[in-house]
Every structure is written in structure tokens, then in C-alpha cells.
């Protein structure tokens, strides 16, 4: 359904460089959740950053079945400073992407590929650290990659999250220079999983600082110009009117019970309760309008709503931990795209 969409609709370039360094970014992703947040991040940089401007082009992987989009990708790749890809698990399209990107990989300043098929992951390039080298290494990361490379996207992403949490122990097995680049890769993954426009803005500025800018351009961009990732729960409970995400069902139900915008009937412990299963990326990137509409409609019909989310594709954990303790009358998978 994406093949008739022209990828040029996602192209953003600064109106005026004002003497700033122009950095060209190309990204290829599975679904459209990141489009809005990335676009907002780039527009914020172009409007307000004193030393850096971004030109960005984006593609959904299915769009590469269209020959016009594929040729456009190859043209964009040829002049890119930064390449980003995520969740590329469709085999024929993964091979097509590698064929377009691999000839230009050495010319990138940096390439960051998040959970994808092994041949796509090998396109990663961050300083002296390259995932393509891990097959010849005896490091902890190498063993992790070998065990995970045949697994599904959900298992791979869950494994990457575990690796992220044990990063200090992993880095001690690498030489200092490679350890720093490995840290930057995992830091990039934190920014990406955070998904908000703020996180993605800081992600792009971090890559610019560490890998793109040289000499005077680098001196203009101090590390203070970007912030550490804002980390959101891997799984939990969300509501469009709540002040934050919840990691405990009791905290969520306590908040629900003191809401002033709903009737007493909804606060009744015996009120019907509908559990929703949501995908985390839609929430952190702000691509949540369909979730908001579902919650509002169910509440208007007299049902209490308990929307749980998870970061991977395995929703059994949040269902077991949150929904089964919430006196649920019905469960609905709300992953509608």
C-alpha cells in the first residue's frame, strides 16, 4: 500500500543556511511512527541551531518496491553524511537496501542501523567500531550478535535492551577507542527508543558532534548543545490525560479514581474495564491519535480503560503483569496503523 507514495514528501531542507554546516541525513524504517518526530526534530534544529542545519530524506522500506523511490534513495544515499535504518526484516527488501547502501558505506561519516536482518546490521559504521567486525571478535558483543542474528525482530530488540542495561560490563572487553564508539552506538539506541522529537533532535546533534563535524565546525558545537536521552519505560500503562506513564497498575487505578473529568460510574470498581494493548513506539513518537480516539470512545460508552504498552512485539509480559491484575472485562489489540 506504500508503493504509490512518493518518498519526496518527507524531504526537509533548511530555508537558509546562515553560514551553518549542512548535514545530509537519510533514513529507512519499517513504519511511519518516526516520521513526525524526526521531521519536528529537524525543523527545530534548522530554525534555532546556530552552527548546524539538517537536510533529511526518509523512506518506508515497502516504498522501495517502487522503482522511482528506489532510484531516489540511491541518489540521496550518494551524498549522505548520516544513514539510519531500523526494523528491516523483509528479506527481499533488505537485500535491495543493502545493494543501494553498501557501495556508499565508506563515504558516510556515520551509519546507524537498529534491529534488522544481519546483512543490514553490518552496514553500521561508527568510528572504529563496526558491527561487521564482530563475527571475528571474541567479545561479549560478538557472542550476543551470533546468538541473536537468526532470531526475530522482537527477540533481537529485547536482547538489545538487555545489552543496553549491561553496557558497562560489556565495554570493558573492548579497546578504549572502540569502547567509546560502542557506547555511542548504544546511546544512539537509547535516543531512538525514546522516540520523542526532543530525543531525536539530540540524537542527530550527538552524531554530528561525534562523527560529522571537523575542525572549526566541531568547535562551534559544544557537547552542552545536546542532552542525554530521556528514557521512557520499556513497558507500562499509558493514558492520554495522565501526567506520565505508569509502571504499576495500582498507581494507574489510583490516578484513575481521582480524575475530575469522568463520571462516578467510571470510578465504580464494578464498572466494565477494557484492556488495550498498545505499541510503545506510537506513544513516545507522538503518533498516538488513533489510540487517543479509542480511549475517548470507550470511556464515552461507559467503560474504564486500561491501556498497556510494550517496546517489542511480545505483549505477553504487560498483559500478564498489568491487565490480569486489573479486573479486565475484555482485551483489545489496538495496534492499528
Question: What is the predicted role of each segment?
Answer:
Residues 1-337:
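An N-terminal assembly and electron-transfer interface module characteristic of large anaerobic redox
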